[in-house]
From Swiss-Prot:
GO terms for molecular function: dynein complex binding. It is found in: Cytoplasm, Cytoskeleton; Cytoplasm, Cytoskeleton, Spindle pole. Its main location: cytoplasm. Gene3D superfamilies: 1.20.960.30, YVTN repeat-like/Quinoprotein amine dehydrogenase. GO terms for biological process: cell division; establishment of mitotic spindle orientation; microtubule sliding. This is Nuclear distribution protein PAC1. Dimerization mediated by the LisH domain may be required to activate dynein. Residues 9-41 form the LisH domain. Positively regulates the activity of the minus-end directed microtubule motor protein dynein. May enhance dynein-mediated microtubule sliding by targeting dynein to the microtubule plus end. Required for nuclear migration during vegetative growth as well as development. Required for retrograde early endosome (EE) transport from the hyphal tip. Required for localization of dynein to the mitotic spindle poles. Recruits additional proteins to the dynein complex at SPBs. It holds the Pfam family WD40. Belongs to the WD repeat LIS1/nudF family. Residues 61-88 form a coiled coil. The gene is PAC1. HAMAP family: lis1 (MF_03141).
Length: 456
C-alpha cells in the first residue's frame, strides 16, 4: 500500500499513538506497539511520552474544527453562487443570439413603477446599466435596468420633465434634462447626479435636449420655435437656430456632430449643417406629413445598405455624410423615411394613433416605433418598410417614448468641422459606421406611469 506520510510524519504519528495509549491506562497495548516499532526506552522515554500524550487529541479536535469550517464555507459558497446567478444579466446566461437581428418580444423583462404621472422620456447611460426617465411629476428617476431597481430620484425642475439625454462632453458622462419650466439642467452622475448647471434662454417649454457627439455642445428644441446650441462648459447659448414656424418638438444630432435634424408642429422636418456653428445652414426642408411631427431620427450608417437601393443610389456600402437618411413620426399616424435630398422614400402605415417615438435598430435593418395605440412595431427596411412584428398592448395606455441602449463605440473617423464646400470627396468617404457592440435592450415609457424593459 502506498504511504501518504513521510517517514518523519509516520514516526510522529506512532509516538503520538503510544503516548495516547499510555496516558489512557493501556500499557500492554502501548508496549506491544512499541515492540512492533522497535522503540526502546532510550528512544522513547517517559519525558518524550509526556510531550506526545496530548498531541493526538489536539490534532483530532483540529480536524473536527476544520471539517466544520469547510462545511460552513461550502454552504456560504453555495449561497453566494446562487446570489451571483440571480445578479448575472440574463443576456449572459442565455445562449448568445445574433444581435443584428434581435427584436423585442413580449413580455418585458421588467415593468418598473415609481413615477406618479406620465413618463415622457427615457435615456440609457452610454456604458453602465443606468437608465433615466423623466415625468410629468416633475422628477427624473435613475434605474438599474439590469436589476430592475430604482436607484434614486432627482428633483430640481418645477414643471414636467419633457426630455433627458446622456452624453460625454470632454470625456465626462453627463445627464441633461429639459422641462416645461423653460430650463435645461445638467447633472453629474460621478457626483451622485448633482445638478451642476442650469441653462436658461428659451421663452417657452423645452421639449427636446441632445448632446452633440464629438463636440462640447448641447442642442435643445422648444415651443418658442427655436433650436438652441449651448456650450456645456460655460452654459452659454452659442447659437439660436430659427426656421421652424411652430413648436419644435424633437431634435437629433448626427453621430459626427456636424448635422442636426429637427421636427415640429409646422409639419416639417429640417436638416441643419452645424459644422460651422456661427453660420448654421438649413440644408433641406422635408414636407409631406398631414399633422404635427412628434419625433425624428437620423439613420445610422448601417442602414445605408438597405435604404440606398430605395433611393436609387449605387456605390460603396457606407454613406458619404452622417446624415444620408432620416425618419419622422407624426400625429397623422404614419412614419416617413427620407433621404438627404428631401425625397420621401417610404411611408410606413400601420399605427392607429399618433406616432410618439421612433428609433433605428443599431444594425440598420429595422426601424422601431411606439404609438398612442399602445403598440410597439418593428419595420423591416430591407422589405420596403414592411411591418414584421407588432407587440400589442406594450403598455396599458398611450406609449410616449422609446429608447435603445447604445453600444460602446470605438473611435470613429469624422469629417473635420472646418471642411470647406467643394473640398475633395476623399475626406467624406472616410466616414464609416461606428464599430459598436450592440446591446439588445430597449425601454419604453407610457401614460400608465410604467417603464418597460425589453431585453434579450
Amino acid at each position: 500500500m502506498a504511504r501518504l506520510l513521510t517517514n518523519r510524519q509516520a514516526d510522529e504519528l506512532h509516538k503520538s499513538i503510544i503516548a495516547y495509549l499510555s496516558a489512557n491506562d493501556l500499557p500492554n497495548t502501548a508496549a506491544a506497539l512499541r515492540a512492533e516499532l522497535n522503540l526502546t526506552e532510550e528512544d522513547f522515554d517517559a519525558t518524550a511520552v509526556k510531550k506526545y500524550e496530548t498531541l493526538l487529541e489536539k490534532k483530532w479536535t483540529s480536524i473536527v474544527r476544520l471539517q466544520k469550517k469547510i462545511m460552513d464555507l461550502e454552504a456560504r459558497n453555495a449561497a453566494l453562487q446562487s446570489e451571483l446567478d440571480n445578479l448575472t444579466p440574463a443576456s449572459l446566461l442565455k445562449p448568445r443570439r445574433d444581435p443584428t437581428s434581435w427584436l423585442p418580444t413580449h413580455p418585458p423583462r421588467y415593468s418598473l413603477e415609481s413615477h406618479r404621472d406620465t413618463i415622457n422620456c427615457i435615456a440609457f447611460h452610454p456604458k453602465f446599466s443606468s437608465l433615466a426617465s423623466g415625468s410629468d411629476d416633475f422628477t427624473i428617476k435613475i434605474w438599474d435596468w439590469e436589476l430592475g431597481e430604482l436607484e434614486m430620484t432627482l428633483k430640481g425642475h418645477t414643471r414636467a420633465v419633457l426630455d433627458v439625454d446622456y452624453g460625454s462632453p470632454q470625456g465626462i458622462t453627463m445627464l441633461a434634462s429639459c422641462s416645461s419650466d423653460l430650463s435645461v439642467k445638467l447633472w453629474d452622475p460621478a457626483e451622485g447626479y448633482k445638478n451642476v448647471r442650469t441653462l436658461l434662454g428659451h421663452d417657452h417649454s423645452v421639449s427636446a435636449v441632445r448632446f452633440i457627439p464629438c463636440r462640447n455642445l448641447l442642442a435643445s428644441a422648444s415651443r418658442d420655435k427655436d433650436v438652441r446650441i449651448w456650450d456645456v462648459t460655460t452654459g452659454y447659448c452659442v447659437r439660436s437656430i430659427q426656421g421652424h414656424t411652430g413648436w419644435v418638438r424633437d431634435v437629433c444630432p448626427s453621430f459626427d456632430g456636424n448635422f442636426l435634424f429637427s421636427s415640429g408642429d409646422d409639419m416639417t422636418a429640417r436638416l441643419w449643417d452645424i459644422s460651422a456653428i456661427p453660420n448654421p445652414e438649413n440644408k433641406v426642408t422635408m414636407a409631406g406629413h398631414e399633422h404635427f411631427i412628434e419625433c425624428c431620427a437620423l439613420a445610422p450608417p448601417t442602414s445605408y445598405q438597405y435604404l440606398a437601393p430605395v433611393a436609387g443610389l449605387k456605390g460603396p456600402s457606407y454613406p458619404k455624410s452622417a446624415a444620408e437618411f432620416m425618419a419622422t413620426g407624426s400625429r397623422d399616424k404614419t412614419i416617413k423615411v427620407w433621404d438627404v435630398r428631401g425625397t420621401c422614400l417610404m411611408t410606413l402605415i400601420g399605427h392607429d394613433n399618433w406616432v410618439r417615438g421612433i428609433v433605428f435598430h443599431p444594425a440598420g435593418k429595422y426601424l422601431l416605433s411606439v404609438s398612442d395605440d399602445r403598440t410597439l412595431r418593428c419595420w423591416d427596411l430591407s422589405q420596403e418598410g414592411k411591418c414584421v412584428k407588432t407587440i400589442k398592448d406594450a403598455h396599458d395606455r398611450f406609449v410616449t417614448c422609446l429608447s435603445w441602449a447604445p453600444g460602446v463605440a470605438k473611435d470613429v473617423p469624422a469629417i473635420p468641422s472646418n471642411t470647406a464646400k467643394g473640398e475633395s470627396s476623399e475626406i467624406k468617404e472616410t466616414l464609416k459606421s461606428p464599430d459598436v457592440q450592440i446591446r439588445c435592450v430597449i425601454a419604453t415609457g407610457s401614460v400608465d406611469r410604467k417603464l418597460q424593459i425589453f431585453a434579450a
